[in-house]
Curated annotation (Swiss-Prot):
Database matches in CDD domains: crotonase-like
Record: residues binding NAD(+): M324, D343, V400, V401, E402, K407, S429, N453
Protein name listed in UniProt: Fatty acid oxidation complex subunit alpha
Renumbered residue ranges of the record's region 3-hydroxyacyl-CoA dehydrogenase: 311-716
GO-annotated molecular function: 3-hydroxybutyryl-CoA epimerase activity; delta(3)-delta(2)-enoyl-CoA isomerase activity; enoyl-CoA hydratase activity; long-chain-3-hydroxyacyl-CoA dehydrogenase activity; NAD+ binding
Organism ancestry: Bacteria, Pseudomonadati, Pseudomonadota, Gammaproteobacteria, Alteromonadales
Important for catalytic activity, annotated site positions: E119, E139
InterPro entries to which the protein is assigned, alphabetical: 3-OHacyl-CoA_DH_CS (IPR006180), 3-OHacyl-CoA_DH_NAD-bd (IPR006176), 3HC_DH_C (IPR006108), 6-PGluconate_DH-like_C_sf (IPR008927), ClpP/crotonase-like_dom_sf (IPR029045), Enoyl-CoA_hydra/iso (IPR001753), FA_oxidation_alpha_subunit (IPR050136), FadB (IPR012799)
Pathway: Lipid metabolism; fatty acid beta-oxidation
Keywords of this entry: Fatty acid metabolism, Isomerase, Lipid degradation, Lipid metabolism, Lyase, Multifunctional enzyme, NAD, Oxidoreductase
HAMAP family: FadB
Pfam families: 3HCDH, 3HCDH_N, ECH_1
Organism per entry: Shewanella sp. (strain ANA-3)
Renumbered residue ranges of the record's region Enoyl-CoA hydratase/isomerase: 1-189
UniProt catalytic activity: a (3S)-3-hydroxyacyl-CoA + NAD(+) = a 3-oxoacyl-CoA + NADH + H(+); a (3S)-3-hydroxyacyl-CoA = a (2E)-enoyl-CoA + H2O; a 4-saturated-(3S)-3-hydroxyacyl-CoA = a (3E)-enoyl-CoA + H2O; (3S)-3-hydroxybutanoyl-CoA = (3R)-3-hydroxybutanoyl-CoA
């Protein structure tokens, strides 16, 4: 053994080829500080051996290296620029040391080689992947750029255009795609991986492969003619900005770094990367996006823990077909859990099966599935007009019409047919779980399971704990949601649960602006373009449906009359009473039609303005700051109330609910990250300016105390 540490082992194989194996404790290899220090020491030990002729990098795990240890990032990025620069220069010195070894090097890549893992393989002369490999630089998804030489080496290996696509999208690349562009030199079966890498090194030692020429190319400026370079980078900037927009600076910064470094050798090019990395690491966007990643890990960790308490869900059932039932059935079956789809009407079953078939056909058309897989998934969905096939289900999801009496009746019925230990969940967006539990003989096996529409696209599931729900029930539904590929957050029962409870105060702020003559299209523009929502409030209400919004608003007003009660009609009422239901009937705030390509089209409709003018008078202009304040303050305060009341367990889970359930702008990180970035005291001062507008604008005592102590919701 040449070197051994808890994370890395180095041994000498036949023919004087050294093997460096990444094998950290735990399930995966990460590039944390300990691993980086071990790699540095291992390379020093290797350099001291005079007989080594080549080096192969391998992994003792199912994956190569999943990337940097992101849990270290926020603390590290809070350091002074000088400290951060010192860290990044030391890290890069290790990668340079690997690249500068006086003999050929190769990486044997299996599973993920992402971020720092990808930058490790780029520092070697040859790269051989097996068929399980996924390679990529996802850093821009975290608001930063690669910091261990990725922006320098990748363009010199696969060309600037290909490298910019990899870096700016942050997507994982399949081995066959990596082979096409030259990021890897061969793709082999997993059992042949190490032997293939060693054979390539033997060929290099025997001078059949010119490893020194390959290495020199990575050390040198890019070989791009000046005019071609200018055209390439100008085109890239336009394309990247069109996708990333102004709120996500990292992809554009990556293009600039590659452009500036194009004429430089390795040393100068790395300095350009370092400076850009440090600048981005200090941004609020990086803090927000890294925060989302860490919050996602926390939520997934909780779900994994729940799996230990959970009942094993081998089969499921959904009551109520149609679009929602079909979506739930598709999601369950496509992720491997067979499901019965039960309805009282054959046309509804046909619609549900049609929805599942449509979603599967789209997967096949995009090359993400095959006709054989599609048939297998459809065979996992059993349509039924009676309860007989439901009796074997481990979990039953009730998804009938959103009406308390109908749901209560269906829940009471299904309880008679299922096994004693089957778990029953209601997919409801507004009806109290405690109320529905009254219709059940065993309320301890019952909880809420709120899917968001469309089911196949929306990642969030709210698992709602009723006062009688057992821990096993909650754990089992959380585990089932995870198995379906969803991100579950557990919330306690209250009107609107968590997501809808905080959404409707936002709509109330919007209604308030319209009642004073605000222009809904202008408000949407501000909330989309400036704040960053995927849809402004008027457009979102049209998509949700004004009938659904009208009903949910009434539920919220009844549940929280002091804050959400109304004294008269608002804009939602005006649209609903004039049968303008949104996209579903082609007219809401906007008018909807289909364009020549069959895609839905949204247009401003003069009729909406006439109706609003008749109800609220002449239009009045509001500036962007006031629009943002008056819509967001109520949502933010209500989110804080949910945390204080224990409806949601932590700021992290609340922020994930907002990002995954509502599309809260990821670059802002969620309500609590947004509050911390803004400063709680600054927010309280802003809210106090609007406190005269009513209870939705009045901060809680606990918020005021936190502001007075200069506190924050996240611990740095």
């Amino acid at each position: 053994m040449i070197y051994q540490s808890p994370t890395i082992q180095v041994e000498l194989l036949e023919d004087n080829i050294a093997k460096l194996c990444f094998n950290a404790p735990g399930s995966v290899n990460k590039f944390d500080r300990e691993t980086l220090a071990s790699l540095d020491a291992a390379l020093d030990s290797i350099k001291q051996q005079s007989n080594i002729q080549a080096l192969v990098l391998t992994s003792g795990k199912d994956t190569f290296i999943v990337g940097a240890d992101i849990t270290e990032f926020l603390g590290l990025f809070a350091q002074d620029d000088a400290v951060l620069l010192s860290w990044i220069e030391q890290a890069n010195a290790v990668f340079n040391k690997l690249e500068d070894l006086p003999f050929p090097t190769a990486s044997a890549i299996k599973g993920f080689a992402l971020g720092g893992g990808c930058e490790t393989i780029l520092a070697t002369d040859f790269r051989i992947a097996d068929t399980t490999a996924k390679i990529g630089l996802p850093e821009t998804k975290l608001g930063i750029i690669p910091g261990f030489g990725g922006t320098v080496r990748l363009p010199r290996v696969i060309g600037a255009d290909n490298a910019l696509e990899w870096i700016t999208t942050g997507k994982d690349q399949r081995p066959e795609d990596a082979l096409k562009v030259g990021a890897v030199d061969a793709v082999v079966a997993p059992e042949a991986l190490e032997a293939a890498a060693i054979q390539m090194l033997k060929d290099a030692v025997a001078e059949k492969l010119d490893w020194q020429a390959r290495r020199q190319r990575k050390m040198s400026p890019l070989t791009l003619p000046k005019l071609e370079a200018m055209m390439s980078f100008t085109t890239a900037k336009g394309m990247v900005f069109a996708v990333a927009g102004k709120h996500y600076p990292a992809p554009m910064a990556a293009v600039s770094v590659v452009e500036q470094a194009a004429t430089k050798g390795r040393s100068d090019a790395l300095q350009i990367e370092h400076q850009a990395f440090i600048k981005l690491a200090k941004t609020d966007v990086a803090k927000a996006l890294i925060g989302i990643f860490l919050n996602d890990q926390l939520v997934k960790g909780k779900a994994k823990k729940a799996g230990k308490l959970a009942k094993d869900v081998k089969s499921a059932a959904v009551l109520g077909a149609g679009i929602m039932g079909g979506g739930i059935a598709y999601q369950s079956a496509s992720k491997g859990t067979p499901i019965v789809m039960k309805d009282i009407a054959q046309p509804a079953l046909d619609l549900g099966l049609g929805e599942a078939a449509k979603l599967l056909s789209a997967q096949v058309a995009r090359g993400r599935s095959t006709p054989e897989k599609m048939a297998k998934v459809l065979n996992n969905i059993t349509p039924a007009l009676d309860y007989a096939p439901v009796k074997h289900a481990d979990v039953v999801v009730e998804a009938v019409v959103e009406h308390p009496k109908v749901k209560a009746q269906v829940l009471a019925e299904v309880e008679q047919y299922v096994s004693e230990d089957a778990i029953i969940a209601s997919n409801t967006s507004t009806i109290s779980i405690n109320l529905l539990a009254k219709s059940m003989k065993k309320p301890e096996r019952f909880c809420g399971m709120h899917f968001f529409n469309p089911v196949h696209k929306m990642p969030l599931v709210e698992v709602i704990r009723g006062e009688h729900s057992s821990e096993e029930t909650i754990a089992s539904v959380v585990a089932y949601a995870s198995k379906m590929g969803k991100t579950p957050i557990v919330v306690n029962d209250c009107p609107g649960f968590f997501v809808n409870r905080v959404l409707f105060p936002y709509f109330a702020g919007f209604n308030g602006l319209l009642a004073e003559g605000g222009d809904f299209a202008a408000i949407d523009k501000v909330m989309e373009k400036q704040f960053g929502w995927p849809m402004g409030p008027a457009y979102l209400l049209d998509v949700v449906g004004l009938d659904t919004g009208h009903h949910a608003q009434a539920v919220m007003a009844e549940g929280f009359p002091d804050r959400m009660g109304k004294s008269g009609n608002d804009a939602i009422d005006v649209m609903f009473e004039n049968k303008r239901l949104g996209q579903k009937n082609g007219k809401g705030f906007y008018a909807y039609s289909v364009d020549s390509r069959g895609k839905p089209k949204k247009d401003v409709d003069p009729t909406s303005y006439e109706l609003l003018k008749a109800a609220f008078g002449e239009q009045k202009a509001f500036d962007a700051d006031e629009i943002i304040a008056r819509t967001m303050i109520p949502m933010i305060i209500e989110t804080v109330r949910c945390l204080e009341e224990g409806i949601v367990a932590s700021p992290a889970e609340a922020d994930m609910g907002l990002v995954y359930g509502l599309g809260f702008p990821p670059f802002r990180g969620g309500v609590f990250r947004y509050l911390d970035t803004m400063g709680v005291a600054n927010f309280v001062a802003l809210a106090d300016k609007y406190a005269h507008l009513g209870g939705l604008y009045q901060v809680t005592d606990a918020m005021r105390a936190l502001a007075a102590n200069n506190g924050s919701y996240y611990q740095a």
